[in-house]
Regions:
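Conserved ABC transporter NBD signature motif
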Residues: 63-75
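Conserved ABC ATPase signature
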Residues: 132-136, 140
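Helix-to-loop junction immediately C-terminal to a conserved catalytic motif
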Residues: 55
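A short, proline-enriched helix->beta-strand linker immediately N-terminal to the Walker B motif
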Residues: 151-155
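Conserved structural motif at the start of ABC-family nucleotide-binding domains
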Residues: 7, 24-26
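Conserved ABC ATPase "signature" region
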Residues: 103, 110-128, 179-180
Length: 262
């Protein structure tokens, strides 16, 4: 039985500056239900713009993006995004930040309280519910952003380099925690892992988190190659790095990123 496609990008193109700057062109990508796809590419090639288009935050000049059979025109309640720079509201506590999206979605007050408690604890922030962002480390702030997204119990999780600004130790801890959540707990009320699209500059991170890696060219971005990560799950970052396939996959990604394209 074929696995359903949850998110489909069809001949997507995006320009800025009145059409003078083409960010990406003719992109086609299909992401299956419960699949984790990591996107690698040079700086400025449009990775973040593509992710924002998947969420309905920016429009396309050509092509379309389809989620569950419907064209994406605006943000959807079953899609959640985690931003690179946390995106927290500094005047709100941890609890209030995590609850914010649920309140906008009109979730019942009791359900909001239950979900906030569940996901704050899941990301390791129990005891910090009343804390404000300025009192938290970068890693803890990103945990808040992750809890806020997970609390929506989304079908699709969009991650825009969420660990890129963190130190190496904190980054690996959060990578392992994300793997654990997706592989064992799930984000839809514990029923199943969400579909995930994860933007990163780190080859190691892409291999650790992804079922497939999409390598983009320099701007205007096109898909150079899609690589299957044939390392079994469940995984940890350490187990991936120690796997015999890791070096080959890393070198293959490096070669693609280093090659100059027309």
């Amino acid at each position: 039985m074929a696995v359903a496609e949850r998110l489909v990008v069809e001949r997507a193109s995006k320009t800025f500056s009145g059409g003078e700057l083409t960010v990406f062109a003719d992109l086609d990508l299909a992401v299956r239900d419960q699949e984790s796809v990591c996107v690698l590419g040079p700086s400025g090639c449009g990775k973040t713009t593509l992710l924002r288009a998947m969420h309905g935050l920016v429009g396309l000049d050509e092509g379309r993006i389809v989620v569950d059979g419907s064209v994406v025109l605006r943000p959807r309640s079953n899609v959640a995004m985690v931003f690179q720079h946390f995106g927290l509201m500094p005047w709100k506590s941890v609890t209030a930040n995590v609850a914010y999206g649920l309140e906008l979605a009109g979730v019942a007050r009791q359900e909001i309280a239950e979900r906030v408690t569940r996901y704050v604890e899941l990301v390791g922030l129990k005891g910090f519910e009343r804390s404000y962002p300025h009192t938290l480390s970068g890693g803890m702030q990103q945990r808040v952003g992750l809890a806020r997204a997970l609390a929506m119990e989304p079908d699709i999780l969009l991650m825009d380099e969420p660990f890129g600004s963190l130190d190496a130790q904190t980054r690996e801890i959060l990578q392992d925690e994300l793997l654990s959540i997706l592989q064992t707990t799930g984000v839809r009320g514990g029923r199943a892992p969400a579909t995930m699209v994860f933007i990163t500059h780190s080859i190691e991170e892409a291999i650790a988190l992804g079922d497939r890696i999409v390598v983009l060219s320099a701007r205007p971005a096109r898909i150079r190659e899609t690589i299957s990560v044939d390392i079994p799950r469940p995984r940890t970052v350490a187990s991936v790095v120690a796997h015999p396939r890791f070096v080959e996959l890393r070198d293959r990604c490096w070669r693609l990123l280093r090659e100059r394209t027309a």
